Amino acid sequence: MDYLPMFAKLDGRPVLLVGGGEVALRKARLLLAAGARLTLVSPELEPDFHQFADRFTHLAERFTPAHLTGQILVVAATDDLEVNALVYQSANQLGLFVNVVDDPKRSSFIFPSIIDRSPIMVAVSSGGKAPVLVRLLRERLESLLPRHLGALAELSGRVRDQAKRVLSSISDRRRFWERAFASNTLAGLIEKEDWQGAEQWLNDGLDQAKNEVGEVVLVGAGPGDPGLLTLKALQQIQQAEVVLYDQLVSPEILDLVRRDATLVSVGKKAGAHSVPQEETNRLLVEYAKAGNRVVRLKGGDPFMFGRGGEELEVLAEEGIPFSVVPGITAAAGATAYAGIPLTHRDHAQSAVFITGHCQIDGKEPDWQQLAATSQTLVIYMGLMRSEHIQQQLVSHGRSSATPIAIIERGTTARQRVLTGTLADLAELAAQAVSPSLIVIGEVVALRERLAWFGEGQQQGTCDLKLVSLA
């Protein structure tokens, strides 16, 4: 970053402003609003300065370096380039922060564009590179931030000490304030300027928060691309105090989790269950009963082969509040990024999703039904049993010439798509790594025309790869 954003407390501190025109007038109003003890150096002043002449000291003379004595901050706002340069050089020699208006090269600090909801202040800056863009951003933020935001901050300041007495844990207080600030009830009371009612609402909330249990939100992280997160999923992971995540959740998505949250890996890979499901269930209950806002973050959609239903059953038995944020499942996301439509009027009237894992009782799926030619078959976690899947489909009537694709790390920058026919499935699977999705059906052939993502990634058929290896 070119500049460090920070807020300076100028109340009663000496600040020098050089200039007496309209630009200097704007800076004077801003500095006085911040409580600065302002000295203004200029032979002449705009008439409007006289409206608040009793709030600053005016020296009707040209600037000299001696004017810097005792100042902590300096602003040059003249149209005289030589004067501005002298102010900059003199202040620099004394190690003072100096701003030359509209001259970033001669400024050790700059004034940002400000959205004022005192005591809430929002500052936006481009470092002088794009002032029009900054103005547009400020206008957008002005329209988004409610006018009662400052009043809400003042109110919370009055209740803050009481919150510390009632809720000894920092995490408990943080949770209380997050829920309060998100409450439409509190916002409505403040909108009506019912300050007494709003303060009473907060105090009542503190009494309830003392014995409050936490909650769990089951969140689908989508297939990998952070851009495919839903807005609600993003909100939940940024509000979470504890996040239990699977190995399928991409690092880019984990980077979006709030920095002070506790991250717990309960990752699973096919054939390598690093954390038993029972332990995951125990952790969910333990963290929630400690009063935490817990997010259970799963790749894809939590109810699509993600054991989300099993985890919610445990929470229900324990009386822990929960909610669910669906995600884009890999079958929808990865195939779209691979240019493979799941259904097509000419090729597939339906799509079937199955898991390649064996059921606990060893029962086989209905292969006769899965081998139907008018549907697309999508197999999650099927690499390890690819040879068995291939044999069963062919033996139950699916043509060995049926187009197939294996989508590896779908929707991410490392996406790779291996294509071939059903006869090649086991051989292609041996070249793929998890997480991968197997797609079987005539729609795969459309990829040759519809592929759009991952230019330069592997798109050859099994036959071409075999030739290159010979």
UniProtKB/Swiss-Prot annotation:
Reactions this protein catalyses: uroporphyrinogen III + 2 S-adenosyl-L-methionine = precorrin-2 + 2 S-adenosyl-L-homocysteine + H(+); precorrin-2 + NAD(+) = sirohydrochlorin + NADH + 2 H(+); siroheme + 2 H(+) = sirohydrochlorin + Fe(2+)
Region (Precorrin-2 dehydrogenase /sirohydrochlorin ferrochelatase): 1-202
Keywords: Cobalamin biosynthesis, Lyase, Methyltransferase, Multifunctional enzyme, NAD, Oxidoreductase, Phosphoprotein, Porphyrin biosynthesis, S-adenosyl-L-methionine, Transferase
Positions of the UniProt region annotated as Uroporphyrinogen-III C-methyltransferase: 214-470
Binding site for NAD(+): E22, V23, P43, E44
Catalytic-site annotation from UniProt: D246 (proton acceptor), K268 (proton donor)
Residues engaged in binding S-adenosyl-L-methionine: P223, G299, G300, D301, T329, A330, M381, G410
InterPro entries, per database record: 4pyrrol_Mease (IPR000878), 4pyrrol_Methylase_sf (IPR035996), 4pyrrole_Mease_sub1 (IPR014777), 4pyrrole_Mease_sub2 (IPR014776), CobA/CysG_C (IPR006366), NAD(P)-bd_dom_sf (IPR036291), Siro_Cobalamin_biosynth (IPR050161), Sirohaem_synt_dimer_dom_sf (IPR037115)
Keyword presence, NAD: yes
GO BP field: cobalamin biosynthetic process; methylation; siroheme biosynthetic process
One of the record's GO molecular function terms: sirohydrochlorin ferrochelatase activity
Phosphoserine modifications at: S126
UniProt cross-references to Gene3D superfamilies, sorted A to Z: Cobalt-precorrin-4 Transmethylase, Domain 1, Methyltransferase, Cobalt-precorrin-4 Transmethylase, Domain 2, NAD(P)-binding Rossmann-like Domain, Sirohaem synthase, dimerisation domain, Siroheme synthase, domain 2
Pathway: Cofactor biosynthesis; adenosylcobalamin biosynthesis; precorrin-2 from uroporphyrinogen III: step 1/1; Cofactor biosynthesis; adenosylcobalamin biosynthesis; sirohydrochlorin from precorrin-2: step 1/1; Porphyrin-containing compound metabolism; siroheme biosynthesis; precorrin-2 from uroporphyrinogen III: step 1/1; Porphyrin-containing compound metabolism; siroheme biosynthesis; siroheme from sirohydrochlorin: step 1/1
Superkingdom: Bacteria
A Pfam family that the UniProt record links to this protein: Sirohm_synth_M
EC identifiers of the protein: 2.1.1.107, 1.3.1.76, 4.99.1.4
Protein's UniProt keywords contain NADP: no
Family: In the N-terminal section; belongs to the precorrin-2 dehydrogenase / sirohydrochlorin ferrochelatase family.
Function: Then it catalyzes the NAD-dependent ring dehydrogenation of precorrin-2 to yield sirohydrochlorin. Finally, it catalyzes the ferrochelation of sirohydrochlorin to yield siroheme.
Name by which UniProt lists this protein: Siroheme synthase 2
